[in-house]
């Protein structure tokens, strides 16, 4: 469970951080407000597609090819890394692609996490383990969003103020304009998510024999006993 918790902490924590900051990222890169709204809409739309896709595809791979579901989690986290790199090193229009990737990978993680919990640990303590898995999400978001991204963004904004000869007391809110504002935070998020992918890969190795067996046998037996 701790391996899955760590992968969830890294994956969902980084994804929530990216989603929460997407509007401000667009502002920093000079996109108009209407375009920034489009980025948020793209995240929401592809979040839905990610949930449907990961559930359907991972189930098909298990039934037909006995592929461990955690492998799908690994691939989703690696995909998320691409989205973060596009934010850290933006090109013209690249934030559109980043929004799609971030939204898709964020949505894809959720069904996988809770399906993996039920398959590996059963339903007896599912509610407890479910909430433990849920805890990793806000915990990761707080650390990566508030303590990391927010701190580094404010630091870059203060540097911009110093270049203009201004002080913190002379402005109402800190605003950073330029690609440098989110570069370091998203480089760190990329490495954190990659570490989460490696962690989930450990789970793939440890569960490959289990997924080669009839994993739904115990669920059928429980249903028949009712």
Place the predicted regions along the sequence by residue.
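Extracytoplasmic gate region of multi-pass secondary transporters
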Residues: 1-56, 110, 114-117, 141-149
């Amino acid at each position: 469970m701790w391996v899955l918790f760590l992968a969830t902490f890294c994956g969902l924590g980084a994804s929530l951080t990216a989603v929460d900051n997407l509007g401000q990222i667009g502002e920093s890169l000079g996109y108009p407000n209407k375009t920034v709204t489009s980025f948020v809409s793209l995240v929401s739309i592809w979040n839905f597609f990610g949930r449907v896709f990961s559930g359907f595809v991972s189930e098909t791979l298990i039934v037909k090819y006995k592929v461990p579901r955690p492998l799908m989690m690994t691939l989703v986290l690696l995909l998320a890394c691409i989205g973060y790199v596009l934010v850290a090193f933006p090109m013209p229009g690249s934030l559109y692609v980043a929004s799609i990737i971030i939204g898709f990978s964020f949505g894809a993680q959720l069904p996988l996490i809770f399906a993996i919990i039920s398959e590996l640990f059963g339903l007896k303590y599912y509610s407890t383990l479910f909430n433990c898995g849920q805890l990793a999400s806000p915990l990761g978001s707080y650390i990566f969003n508030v303590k990391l991204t927010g701190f580094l963004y404010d630091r870059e904004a203060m540097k911009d103020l110093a270049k203009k000869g201004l002080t913190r007391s002379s402005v109402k809110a800190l605003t950073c304009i330029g690609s440098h504002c989110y570069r370091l935070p998203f480089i760190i998020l990329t490495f954190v998510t990659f570490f989460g992918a490696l962690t989930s890969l450990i789970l793939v190795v440890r569960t490959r024999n289990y997924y080669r067996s009839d994993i739904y046998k115990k669920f059928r037996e429980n249903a028949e006993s009712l």
